[in-house]
Each structure stands twice: as structure tokens, then as C-alpha cells.
Amino acid sequence: MNMISPYCFFLLLLLAAFGFYSQGFGATQLPENEVQALQSIAKTLGINNWNPSVDECNKRQGRNNWSSCWEFKDDEYQNVVICNCSIDTVCHVTNLCMKRQNLPGTLPPELVRLPYLQEIDLTLNYLNGTIPREWGSLNLLNITLGGNRLTGPIPKEIANISTLKSFVAESNQLYGDLPPELGNLTQIQRLILSSNNFTGELPATLAKLTNLQDIRLGDNQFSGKIPDFIESWTNLKALNIIGSGLSGPIPSGISKLRNLTDLRISDLSGSEISSFPDLSNKSMKYLILRNCNIHGTLKDYLSTTEISQILDLSFNKLTGPIPPSYKELIKVNYIFLTGNLLNGSVPSWKSDATSLDLSYNNFNKDNQQCQYGKVNLFAASSPTINNSGIVSCLRSSVSGCPKVNSIHINCGGTSSVKVKGITYDEDGRDGTALFDRGQNKNWAVSTTGDYMDVEAEYSTASLNDTSALSSNDAYHQLYNDARVSPISLTYYGFCLHNGNYKVKLHFAEIMFTNDQTYKSLGRRLFHIYIQGTLVEKDFNIAKEAGGVGKAIIKAYTAAVINNTIEIRFYWAGKGTTIIPKKSVYGPLISAISVENENGGSISTGAVIGIVAAVVIIIIILVLSVLWWKGYLGNKNSPSRGPSILAYIAAAHQSK
């Protein structure tokens, strides 16, 4: 009998060992208690098509090399269980990623039965209820709950999770004061609480969160001033307090945040004056200080600040000229200086800018164009320079224009629409920092802003499924399209007869859905101004109309005294920004109707007709008096029968 060589024997032994290991690994299972926990969690979340088993980790083979739910794309549907199978040759659940499933249940307290769990991601579902206090006993690293229907306050027990690095609960309906205990989360790096209903002042204990890198508190109802203690967040990279309810001034301590690359502050409450913070020697992606009541001049050092995406200083009280050094900012994707008091000459480098908005300022009248490439110059000159009522850049093109009594606009529509015999003009041009005046039209549109955090550049919206509209009246075709804007949207009418006008604004929310999915949970709010007067604050289309896809017409009276009318819509930082996707927020308008209440001023022909009629009546009266006196043959007037006046009186009585 042939003997097996040592080499072959070793090879067979190695193969046998590998086969044994493979069999053992393939049979690695979840402990029964974790299986039961998953089954209970699935029931609480409202998952009907998932029955977890001991082979749950093996069924998801290949995913156990992933370490976090963040490794998936933002727009992906997720139903992922990540396991760690290297602990005592037994698998344990470490991550639950249940994203974009429209789950209708509640947050599961049963998570405490998964002792190795590090992350729970339930973003963009339809979950309701409160955040379980029981979660405070877990050793979680990441909690992500954005885009649901969660209510109630943040339980103070959450602050017991000393391992927590990220807590995301944006775009829910949470309320109440932030618990001071949150200051105990000393390991936390991300705290995202935007788009809720939180109130009260920010707890002073938050100063202890020195590891914070990203904090977002926008779209809430906080009170008090922006706290000075933010200067203690020395590792901070992103600060977002857009429309937060907090008041100014902007703390000077922001200059100490050397790692800051994303600063967004807008629409501060109160009337406190802010100075321009020192942001020199920084490299920033976003610098947004909008409507913060900032006084003073533009700072030269901004020209050396590396700003890559957006510089937005709109709607402040900035004065003086644009510094020549700002030519270095032409590489910034978007620059918005709208609505300030800037003066001097429009910079010569404007033609090199990627996208620049200088509308509504006090620049010298050395420019006759409202749009120069991608530069919006509408109303960029001082109104004191032009007393005609027409903004300077339109003055020459509409000089001597015939007066009209109405304006009708199919906002965002690519074609005109005829409704009840009235034509609504098309308004379909797209883009940011946009000014557009259609040919032979007596109106223009100006829009300001860029949708943040997405590579989207649009200013119109369309409804693909017109069956979603519940409007069946004659105006329904006006609601298939709309014009939208990230910040400010202005319609400007000119060549109008002076007088009182009825302004009708047509709205229908067409970017959210009317169902039980996360896409229905968006909230859109914006201000409406007519002739500079605020007529609607935080206007919510769906709420006013009684639901998504329902039309509503808001009517107002406006006085036109200089042949012009201005209708402006402004986003003050309120409402969700991630539902149904990022970039859905800000003003939306479907159609505009402006009509003279008196049916218009009297035409020249009508005036001639009226004058002629008056002259004839006067002649008749004079002749009648003369005849009555006997100068026209009436020698015995009492006996000569009825006069012309009597016939006239008799004729009136017979009617």
C-alpha cells in the first residue's frame, strides 16, 4: 500500500480544517433572545413583510463588512441589519437601518433587548409617538430619526447615553425646552434638531459639548439671544441657526471657531444690531448671514476668505461700495447681496461672476440692464435717482408705454393659459439670481437664492401626476406648474393705471403628497408682501387650503399710485428642507391676477363721449329756459301747453 507523503497529508489536514471552519461560520446564528427582540421591534415599527430568524445575519451576507448606516446613499431605501459575528463566534445585531420605508408604527422601546446595538436609523418614515425613555440605558453611537411624525420633548434620559456621538431628530414635531441634561453628552459630535417646535432658551450646559462638529437648530421657536458660549465649541465645523427664533446680536466669539466651514444664520428675531463677525483666515463652503440686521460696510478680508459655494449677505443694512478686492470672489458659485444699501458703481468684474445678485440696492445709475449674464441687477439703483415709479433698468424700455388695467401670470408655466376668456402669460424661464421680463409684457419677475446642499438649480416646479390635484374648477390648469424660489421671489407690474386693485394669488401645494408616507410630512412656510406691506406671515399653502393638492385663492386690495405694483414672497427659514427630498422649501406661487377694482380708468373716447353728452344737456336746458321765458315764440307761456321740461319729467315718470 502506498504511503501518503507528509506534504499531501498536511494539505488534506489543512483542507479539512478549512471545511470545518467554513461550516461553523456558515452556521453562525443570532441568539434566540435577539431574534425575539427583532421580531418585537418589527411589530412595533409596523413592518409587515419581515420575520427575523436566527439566520438573519447569514441572509444578509456581505453586509457584515459595513460598519454604519451612513455607508448607504442618502436616497436609498434601506432595510438592513448589520451584525458583528466575531464575538464568541456568535452574531450580534449592531446596526438597524430602516430608512425610507414609510413605517407607520412607533419607536420601539424593545431596542434595549439588543445589548450590542450601536446605531438605529429610521430616517424618512411615517413613525409617530414619542422618543422612548428606555433608550437611555443603551450604549448607542448614532440615533437618526429625521423626517417622521414624532412628538413630545426630548427625554432627559437620552443624556444618559454617554457613548452617543450623533443625535438627529430634524423634521419632526418635537416640542418643549431642550433638557439641560443634554450637556452631559460630552462625546456628541452631531446634534441636528432643525424643523421642530422647540422653545425656550438654549441651556447653558450645552457649553460643555466641546466635541461638537455639527449643530443645527433652525426652524424652531427658541427664545433669547444667540448664546456667547458657542465660542466653547472649538471643534465646530457647521453651525446652522436659520429661522431659529433666536435674536441677535451675532456673538463676536464666532471668530474663535477656527474649524468652521459652514456658517448659516438668518432671520434673527428682535431689532438688535449686529456687527459683521471676524471670519478672516477661514476656509468656508457656506457663509450665510441673511436678514441679521447687520450694519456697516463689506469687509475687505472676505476677499481672502476661501468661500467655495455660497456667500449670502442679503437683506441687511450694509452700506458703502463693493470693495475692489471682491474681484477675488468670482470663483464663489453664488453671491447674494440683495436688499442692502450698497452704493457706488456696480463692479466691472460682474461679467466674470458665476452667479451674482445685486438687486434692490442703491448703486449709481450707470447700468441700464436688469440682467447681465448671470448677474441680477433689477432695482439695483437708488430709488431717489428715478422719480417716475419705474425701476431704472426698465425705465427706457417701458417709457411711454400704454397704461393697462390688469396683469395675469401663469407662474412657472411654460405656456400661456386661457381661463374664462382671460389669458395668463407664460412664466417658464428657469435659473437662480434670475430677472426675466417677457417680450411685450407689463410685468417682470426677479428671484434670489440657491437651494443648499444639493446640486439643483431650478426656479419652477411641475406636477407630474395631475390627478393629485383636487381642483376641478376653471382654474385647475393653472395649478399644474408653479414658480418657486429658495429665498426671495418678486413680481413687479408696471404701466398700470393708478387706483385700487384686487390682487388674487393662486396657490396649490404640488411638491408634497396627500397620503400616509414621509413625502406628505413636508411643511412649506413663507411671507407675502404687497406694495412693501406684510400681508401674510409664515403662510402655509397646504394648511390654508385644507390639504396638499388643493387650490386656494387669496385676495387682497392694493393701491397703485405710481403706476407700479410689487408682490414679493420671502422664505424666512421656516418649514422643512429635506422632505420629500433636499431642496424643497421656500415660496411657491401658481398664478397671479391683478385687476383694477373700477374696471380701469376712463378711456379717451369715453371722456369725449361724456363731455359731448354734458354739452348737449346744457344746450337743451338753456333752450328750455329761453322758450319758457318767451324768447323762442312762447308769448303766453301759462296757456301754451306743457314745456320741454314737463315732457322730460313725464318721460321719467313713465319709466
Mark where each language-model region is.
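Short, surface-exposed beta-strand/strand-loop-strand elements in extracellular ectodomains
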Residues: T513-L534
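Folded extracytoplasmic luminal domains of secretory or organellar precursors
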Residues: P115, F507-E509, S520-R524
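Short, surface-exposed tryptophan/glycine-enriched loops
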Residues: A542-K581
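Residues within well-ordered beta-strands of beta-sheet-rich folds
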Residues: N410, K502-H506, Y529, T557, ...
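Plant-biased, solvent-exposed loop and capping regions
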Residues: M1-A482, V535, N540, R568-I579, ...
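Short beta-strands within extracellular/lumenal beta-sheet-rich domains
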Residues: S467-N498, A551-A555
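A short tyrosine-centered beta-strand micro-motif
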Residues: L496-T513
